[in-house]
Structure formats: C-alpha cells, structure tokens
Curated annotation (Swiss-Prot):
Gene Ontology MF terms in the entry: calcium ion binding
Note: OEE2 is not necessary for the accumulation of the core PSII particle or for the accumulation of either OEE1 or OEE3.
Taxon lineage: Eukaryota, Viridiplantae, Chlorophyta, core chlorophytes, Chlorophyceae
Predominant location category: plastid
GO cellular component, one term: photosystem II oxygen evolving complex
Cellular compartment(s): Plastid, Chloroplast thylakoid membrane
Protein name according to UniProt: Oxygen-evolving enhancer protein 2, chloroplastic
Keyword terms, alphabetized: Chloroplast, Membrane, Photosynthesis, Photosystem II, Plastid, Thylakoid, Transit peptide
Family: Belongs to the PsbP family.
Functional description taken from the UniProt entry: May be involved in the regulation of photosystem II. Required for high levels of photosynthesis oxygen evolution.
The organelle targeting sequence, given as a residue range: 1-57
InterPro entries: Mog1/PsbP_a/b/a-sand (IPR016123), PsbP_C (IPR002683)
Source species of the chain: Chlamydomonas reinhardtii (Chlamydomonas smithii)
Length: 245
C-alpha cells in the first residue's frame, strides 16, 4: 500500500511505513462554550505562556528591542478564524502562498526553509475519518510534499528508485482526539532529494474538519540539519498545539 501511495502521490520512491507508532498525544481544548480567542487564551495559560505585546506576538521576542524579553517559553499564542496554535516566537509572518487555501504562513528568521502553513478548504465532510484511511488522505494531499520536476533517466543509487531524484519516508503516523472528541490525522515524513540539500526536510502534517465545514491542514517543514540543532522543539511545539474548533 505504501508503494502505491508514493507512486500515485508525488512520483518519488516508496514511502516506508514506520515499524511502530508512537502513543497518541491528546490535544486538549476547553470544554466550555467560549469564543475562539478566549479559548486560545485559556490554552495559552495552560501552557504557562506570558502574554506579549502586539509587536511581540507578530514577530517574536526578536522584535522587542526596547525592553527586556518577557516571553521565555519560546512560543507566542495565535488565534485564527476557526483554529489556534502556538507559534515559534522568533518566526516571522510571510505573504507567500505555497498552496491553495493558505490562511497563515510563518517562517524561521534564520532560514526560510523552515516554515509553517495553515490551510483551510471547504468540504462536505463532517469528520476527518470521512476522507477514508490515513493512507488515502495522505495520498489526496500529496501536493503538500512537492512534485519531482526532473524528467530523465537515472540509476538506482543513493536510496532512490530508477529515474527518481526524490524520495519520502513516512516516519510516523497517528491519530489524536481532543477533549471534544474531534479526531486529527497526523504524519511525520522525511523528504530527500538527490542534491542532498540539508540532508532532507522533515514534514509534519496534521488535519481535521472544523465545525464550520472546513478542512484544516497544518504543515510544518524543517531542514534536517536544523531539526537536530534545536528546530525540532519549535516544530513539535507548534504542531502539537494546533487546535480546531
């Protein structure tokens, strides 16, 4: 199934299934009927975040040049229309639109390879499970991983299939359920290309259906070298905090 998925998905080498699945992490949300922004405030409080000024919230502590740093958590809360999450404090907003339906995009101050996008698309589905299995859903959003642009003959070397210059490995796949019973599909992949740039790129993808009949997708990309130099903490903190109402 994994091989068929990869061939249909983005013409790369087979996606390797993980040997085991990690324990699901429950994303908790407030059970009371409160506004989206109030819910985020409660969530941020639970995460022990110190509130920042508007400039800090938009640009992180690096923008706080006239006073001492007040946010020591490394994250700032963000409340969107229908979703909420914690953003790495030193990431900046970006106006690029990598994919259709992007409603939020942030990128690392130091390396734009590291970025986060939130996508919202209208759907007639009521829950993420209505899209089918996790494999089937990943296939349907394979455009998020990019397409192979090169066309030509190559040898089967370096872990790449013949005539392929990119490959993806599925490192982890899981489902999580929040306090309100909403289910999320979550994936972690490592995508490599023949040029060996950054040793590959880690891709975190999460998805669920909101109460407003929209499919919400979060995608976080981190270069492999930066992943192991501390960016993993930023990526996972944002990824695990993603909540849809």
């Amino acid at each position: 199934m994994a091989t068929a998925l990869c061939n249909k998905a983005f013409a790369a080498a087979p996606v390797a299934r993980p040997a085991s699945r990690r324990s699901a992490v429950v994303v908790r949300a407030s059970g009371s009927d409160v506004s989206r922004r109030a819910a985020l405030a409660g969530f941020a409080g639970a995460a022990a975040l110190v509130s920042s000024s508007p400039a800090n919230a938009a640009y992180g502590d690096s923008a706080n040049v006239f006073g001492k740093v007040t946010n020591k958590s490394g994250f700032v809360p963000y409340a969107g229309d229908g979703f909420a999450l914690l953003l790495p404090a030193k990431w900046n907003p970006s106006k690029e639109n990598d994919f259709p339906g992007v409603i939020l995009r942030y990128e690392d101050n130091f390396d734009a390879v590291n970025n986060l996008v939130v996508i919202a698309q209208d759907t007639d589905k009521k829950a993420i499970a209505d899209f089918g299995s996790q494999d089937k859903f990943l296939e349907s959003v394979s455009y998020l991983l990019g397409k192979q642009a090169y066309s030509g003959e190559t040898q089967s070397e370096g872990g790449f299939a013949p005539n392929r210059v990119s490959a993806a490995s599925l490192l982890d796949v899981s489902t999580t359920t929040d306090k309100k019973g909403k289910t999320y599909y979550k994936y972690e992949l490592l995508v490599r290309s023949a040029d060996g740039d950054e040793g590959g790129r880690h891709q975190l993808i999460g998805a669920t259906v909101g109460s407003d009949n929209k499919l919400y997708i979060i995608k976080i990309q981190i270069g492999d070298k930066r992943w192991f130099k501390g960016a993993k903490k930023e990526a996972m903190g944002a990824f695990d905090s993603f909540t849809v109402v």
